[in-house]
Amino acid sequence: ENSSILVVTEGVFGMTGDLGILPEIIELKKEVPFRLLVDDAHGFGTLGHDGSGTGTQLGCQDGVDVYFGTFAKAGALIGAFVASEPNVIAFLKANSRSQIFAKSLPLPIVATARERLKLIRQHPEWREKLWSNTLKLREGLQKIGYNVLPSESPVTPVLTSGSTQLCTDIMRKMREEHGIFVSGVAYPVVPRGVVLIRLIPTAAHNDEHIEKTLNAFEAIKDFVMAAANKLSA
């Protein structure tokens, strides 16, 4: 049955690493006809037995009508793609402003993306390594005393009380004093008075990298906790 309703959600919510409730959303199609578009920027390449994303991980990929992915995360490249039925793709080609007023990806980028798709499928051990690194990082941060939010993906969010200035200071200290890049998120992306530091380990990291990161977080812990306590006082 055709429907003009389009439901849009994420496979992995990039700030917290939570997975979208795709099976529950798809189940609603039995009551209300709609199409489902899933932005799976963080799930593509990292989730599912073959890296094909959150839908595969949750066993409901066939219920996704329009699938959006990017090569900029797991693919370490540039560019993105939309996968759907031929008539949907034809509609997007003719009506998407970003498609009409943009140039195609350079051929070397396309060729590289195709090869990296093959590598993602052929090397499940890379995903195993990714998850091993993710668990080591999370467990280490928790042992130090940081509040690591539950996450079902490699996205590792560390939450603390603090100001926008604290967020900036943490990023600066990690980068300039320890040579580690972290992504800081402050108000209005998160509630006022909250700072979220986001880390995303990769399969290319090793135990030495993780240990260095944990040591750096331990080194700035007193500074972070003092700022958090000052805000809550």
Where are these regions (language model features)?
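Active-site phosphate-binding strand-loop segment of PLP-dependent enzymes
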Residues: 1-38
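Conserved PLP-binding catalytic core of the aspartate aminotransferase-like
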Residues: 127-138, 142-178, 189, 194, ...
